[in-house]
């Protein structure tokens, strides 16, 4: 089965939980952007968090995550929606370091800690919610945990992980978000905290073949996990040749003529998916005529 996420409740509705397997989704991002291992881990963690946060939205609502920690990777930008679709990129995909002291990919060094995590939710009808917090670790799981507590006032635990093969392909990726509802009993909190200390890294559990449902059983085993919804997850970009053409038309006929005179063609790439669109001279002439009608 491919990538998917689950939404669930546990401990008689005191706890809301999300878990996702994103191995193929992160692999598609790696393939498109040709990211090196540390950059793959950083982008993959952000994509995984983004797709789970997207699952908290409704209808046509969308969400954008921007992570700018001042590190060599530059900015990470992720878009997601309520349908399990996510896309994203890093400014500098060719970043890699030796493993850190814990034997893991050094995401914190790549991302940096001197910056911000920003979340913008487009709730429709020009209604936007923006939350912003300083990065506290650069490892991203801790940073999203802090975001939920500080910006949305929801006590949460976020775990995201990516394992990368020696040939730069993605071996495993996934994550979880556990959130405490108002009035959660102290003994429930204690049991979850103890469980979180005992579990292996989430990427290792995914590598071992655990499903999102089984992840939640590991995290909330005695809490009576009740799955509410299962949703496929994938890397999907909304760019298209038509959208790029519209962007060229919006430049106006003079600007398009300038491109024809100087270049004789136009080429545009989408930041999010790295797809390249080519327009030859004849096509530019057509777009110029359309621009005159605007």
UniProtKB/Swiss-Prot annotation:
Coiled coil: none
Disulfide pattern: 237-239, 270-273
CDD domains noted in UniProt: Hsp33
Signal peptide bounds: none
Keyword Chaperone: yes
GO CC terms in record: cytoplasm
Lineage: superkingdom: Bacteria
Intracellular or extracellular location(s): Cytoplasm
SUPFAM superfamilies, A to Z: Hsp33 domain, HSP33 redox switch-like
Post-translational modification: Under oxidizing conditions two disulfide bonds are formed involving the reactive cysteines. Under reducing conditions zinc is bound to the reactive cysteines and the protein is inactive.
Main location: cytoplasm
Gene3D superfamilies: Hsp33 domain, HSP33 redox switch-like
Gene Ontology molecular function terms on file: protein folding chaperone; unfolded protein binding
Biological process according to GO: protein refolding
Keywords, comma-separated and alphabetical: Chaperone, Cytoplasm, Disulfide bond, Redox-active center, Zinc
NCBIfam families cross-referenced by the UniProt entry: PRK00114.1
Family: Belongs to the HSP33 family.
Functional summary from the UniProt entry: Redox regulated molecular chaperone. Protects both thermally unfolding and oxidatively damaged proteins from irreversible aggregation. Plays an important role in the bacterial defense system toward oxidative stress.
Protein name: 33 kDa chaperonin
Organism (species): Geobacillus kaustophilus (strain HTA426)
